[in-house]
Amino acid sequence: FEDAHYYDEFDRWGEHVVEGSWDAEIVDDLAVREEDHVVVKHTYDAFYRTDLEGHLDAHGIDDLLVCGTLANVCVLHTAGSAGLRDFRPVVVEDAVGCIEESHREYALEHADWLFGETIAREDVAFAPAPAAD
């Protein structure tokens, strides 16, 4: 996801990840490849007003690994939204951050209770990518 927030939410959260600014850029370690699909999200929920659901449906994707900077905000809301849309979200517990550790712990406990599973990065297994045409 590419995070790009609007100015009208800064009264609550302060200025952060402004669309087009340096802090909204995707880091080099996660460089976008030609075959990648980038979803630009403007809210806590990566499904809200984006093409994410349609893209996942079109590619037959049901299982989602969810990670990110704020476990108790974007990660939890995106995972919850995925669950409501009949996807199977799994939060990667050591690939999420938070400002307060107690908020991170709450988010992980809540995700585990809601979705039945959180997972450590070392336990993530990926299926081989399909062969290119």
Q: Model regions: which residues?
A:
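Active-site-adjacent betaalpha module
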Residues: 3, 7-133
